[in-house]
């Protein structure tokens, strides 16, 4: 690309007009954009620490980029009041904090000498693109890495999805516990399971008959699942590209506005989603939504987990607890009947630890309807707006354990009943098999 400088000299037409940081992968930086009419330039910070922390964050991103063939990368720092570059563009701003060479060297050493925080099989940014058949062009998606404590996480802006989450086992071996794809193309063109890792809505789960009535008006929605509307419809919020709003080394906020009428829903719905990796090896997921019309909103995350790690295998040996006295039974098309089923004496009683596979094959109509576990557990939590522990999942083999805390009244536990091994995940040649992933929505 060329800088937007009217005085720039004309380059030799035989030369490749490319800068190092534009080697096939771009890192979106707020305030550093080529969109016409938007501010371009260096980001301004009010403290030296913010400059250094941000520099280190982007420098760590380069570690991911440099693993890709034919990719070059750079982080620019403005070290002087006037900067000249070979194409004739100059910047001059005395209000920008300058970064002295000593601090740059120290930051580089800190990044380079840091221990590798994730295995080499981390998904590469160059794999996150897709082809637009109508235009015949390749579009790049963004893949962001977050790090804190023992955790490393990857998130893409397509559907605000969790792509990877690397966590240690009892022996300190780090592996990816998220089941998904390693290429953006498979997410965009729906290679199999559409909702892998996605943020789903406007309404997660099913709307019976694809219609609802609100304030006396009936709204008809697209039916994308056995005559019902599942996870928002044909487009939802998972099949769109979200906008980067804010990012640190351990957190990211993505935003999307679903326009009035999208998938048949009323109102412009603006959503902010924030992922935060905490220092105690936690993942916080926070949602904020505003609308200009009354509209149903029920957002959720649809990450699929396998605590064995990237080698996969059945999740039937995972041990789960759910703090719930009742579940919400469904009919044959998985729409709630309006009843409340007590878990006492049923395969749905996880108030004490049980392996997932221990009772999944029992003769119960709800297991038959769902092909396994795929119900809403009515949680034993107060409606006080605070987070409460409601579920644990552990793998006796690796020692990995996750605890779910929420301020919501329900938890959908899905045991991966419809994976059939017909498509591969992130590991080449390794299909995602029957009940090799679980979701907690």
Predicted segments — roles?
Residues 4, 18, 87-103, 413, ...:
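Short linear, low-complexity motifs centered on an aromatic residue
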Residues 77-119:
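Aromatic-rich peripheral "rim/lid" segments of glycoside hydrolase catalytic domains that contact
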Residues 52-56, 98, 269, 281:
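Conserved structured core elements
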Residues 62-69, 111-115, 207:
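Short secondary-structure junctions and interdomain/linker hinges
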Residues 119-441:
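An exposed, glycine/acidic-rich loop-and-rim segment of catalytic or binding clefts
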Residues 1-95:
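Substrate-binding/catalytic cleft of secreted carbohydrate-active enzymes
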């Amino acid at each position: 690309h060329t800088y937007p400088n009217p005085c720039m000299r004309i380059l030799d037409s035989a030369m490749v007009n490319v800068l190092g940081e534009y080697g096939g992968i771009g890192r979106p930086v707020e305030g550093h954009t080529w969109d016409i009419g938007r501010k371009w330039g260096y980001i301004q910070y009010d403290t030296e620490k913010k400059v250094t922390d941000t520099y280190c964050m982007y420098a760590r991103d380069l570690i991911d980029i440099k693993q890709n063939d034919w990719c070059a990368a750079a982080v620019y720092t403005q070290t002087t009041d006037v900067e000249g570059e070979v194409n004739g563009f100059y910047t001059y701003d005395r209000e920008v904090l300058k970064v002295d060479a000593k601090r740059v060297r120290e930051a580089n050493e800190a990044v380079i000498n840091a221990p590798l925080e994730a295995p080499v099989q981390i998904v590469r940014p160059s794999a996150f693109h897709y082809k637009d058949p109508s235009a015949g062009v390749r579009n790049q998606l963004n893949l962001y890495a977050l790090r804190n404590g023992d955790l490393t996480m990857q998130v893409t802006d397509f559907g605000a999805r969790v792509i990877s989450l690397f966590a240690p086992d009892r022996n300190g071996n780090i592996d990816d516990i998220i089941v998904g794809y390693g290429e953006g193309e498979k997410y965009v063109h729906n290679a199999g399971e559409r909702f892998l890792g996605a943020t789903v809505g406007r309404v997660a789960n099913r709307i019976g008959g694809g219609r609802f009535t609100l304030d006396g008006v009936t709204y008809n929605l697209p039916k994308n699942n056995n005559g019902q509307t599942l996870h928002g419809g044909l487009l939802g919020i998972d099949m769109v590209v979200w906008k980067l709003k804010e990012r640190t080394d351990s957190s990211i906020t993505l935003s999307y506005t679903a326009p009035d009428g999208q998938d048949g829903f009323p109102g412009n719905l603006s959503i902010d989603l924030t992922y935060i990796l905490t220092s105690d090896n936690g993942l916080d997921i926070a949602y904020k939504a505003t609308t200009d019309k009354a509209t149903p909103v029920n957002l959720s995350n649809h990450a699929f987990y396998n605590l064995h790690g990237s080698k996969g295998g059945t999740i039937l040996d995972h041990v789960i607890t759910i703090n719930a006295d009742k579940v919400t039974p469904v009919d044959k098309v998985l729409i709630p009947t309006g009843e409340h089923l007590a878990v006492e004496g049923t395969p749905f009683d996880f108030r004490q630890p049980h392996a997932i596979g221990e009772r999944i094959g029992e003769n119960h109509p709800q297991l038959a309807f769902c092909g396994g576990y795929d119900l809403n557990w009515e949680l034993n939590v107060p409606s006080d707006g605070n987070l409460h522990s409601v579920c644990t999942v552990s793998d006796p083999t690796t020692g990995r354990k996750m605890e779910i805390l929420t301020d919501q009244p329900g938890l959908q536990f899905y045991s991966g009943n419809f994976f059939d091994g017909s498509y591969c995940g992130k590991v080449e040649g390794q299909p995602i098999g029957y009940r090799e992933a679980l979701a907690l929505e």
